[in-house]
Amino acid sequence: MREAVSITGQGIICAIGNDLPSVLDSLVHARSGIRPMKYLNSRHSELPVGEVQLSNSQMKRILGLEESTLASRTSLMGAIAIKEALAQVGKSRLEGKRVVLISGTTVGGMDLSENYWERMKNEDSLLNLPLCNDCGNSTVEMARMAGLEGVRCCTISTACSSALNSVMLGAEMLRHDEADIVIAGGSEALSRFHLNGFNSLMILDKEPCRPFDETRAGLNLGEGAAFVVLEKDAGSRTLSYVTGYGNRCDAFHQTATSENGDGAFLAMKDALEMAGIAPGDIDYVNAHATGTPNNDLTESRALMRVFGDNLPEISGTKGLTGHTTSASGSI
């Protein structure tokens, strides 16, 4: 087993809560955040989504920002989750340390880009396209709004694996002495671009999604952010350890997993081997469980390949939060 990495802080915001205690309470009581659109303006208003129940203006006030501050919803949610995670650690611990922020996002500031495109058409000018729409700059803006001036920033865009890839990269940086503290996770906001893309794949359910159910008909898109603070073995301050992980790409199809879940199977196998444990040591699996016919079937097959007849408890949370895509791994 390789050197363990400690998780010492956690922060989250999503459709079922604006912080860790409220999210946990919603999970325990199975309160769903899937509801009609409130903040997203879309022609597909019949589709339920998992929206964070705060406007951009409310999030700016939480962060102590002026209303005029130009910030994407992705950056605002990310900054709120980061600040919660840092509050648990104590910001003074960052002083004099090599701190890195790694965020996973694929949509970035698309919520702003969509609105500015309309202005560009009307005003015949490119000057209205703000830099903060870029995925990479979303991470820089999160750092600034969370009071992390001067930290190194990195952005990962690997769709639904983005946030967990951020955690994996952070753990590797610590193990190779490239950083002292890493804040890793992901943030993703709903946007028309986002919704339309998934709708074109015909995998969005008009009812609350039902992962692993025989009658499942698709997913509900969601939004949110979650970040963890990673440190080299932190002793008694450790909330949990990152002991093993795996990353595979079977290159089967751009939007579908292979029939027998080869990528998921190999990634889980790698994670177990890195951690130095056997499948029988696992008590619970939080599955990707999107609610689509393809994902849930192939993921189930991958799990059965790993665990055989001794399946542990398995469940997913997207039926409550919606599929938060790039942020889903850390959420």
Predicted segments, located by residue:
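Condensing-enzyme catalytic core mediating Claisen C-C bond formation in acyl metabolism
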Residues: 3-8, 26-39, 44-47, 204, ...
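Conserved active-site "lid/cap" helical segment
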Residues: 16, 21-103, 109-110, 267-279
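A glycine- and small-aliphatic-rich helix-loop capping segment at beta-alpha/alpha-beta transitions
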Residues: 21-25, 114-125, 142, 173-176, ...
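Active-site nucleophile and cofactor-binding loops and adjacent substrate-binding regions
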Residues: 41-42, 70-75, 129-136, 153-162, ...
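Glycine/charged-rich beta-loop-alpha catalytic/anionic-binding loops adjacent to active sites
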Residues: 60-67, 119-128, 145-156, 205-214, ...
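Claisen-condensing/thiolase-fold acyl-transfer catalytic domains that form or cleave C-C bonds
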Residues: 79, 158-175, 219-222, 226-237, ...
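Beta-strand segments within the central parallel beta-sheet cores of soluble alpha/beta enzyme folds
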Residues: 97-103, 153-157, 182-187, 239-245, ...
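Active-site-proximal gating segment of KS-fold condensing enzymes and close homologs
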Residues: 102-154, 295-309
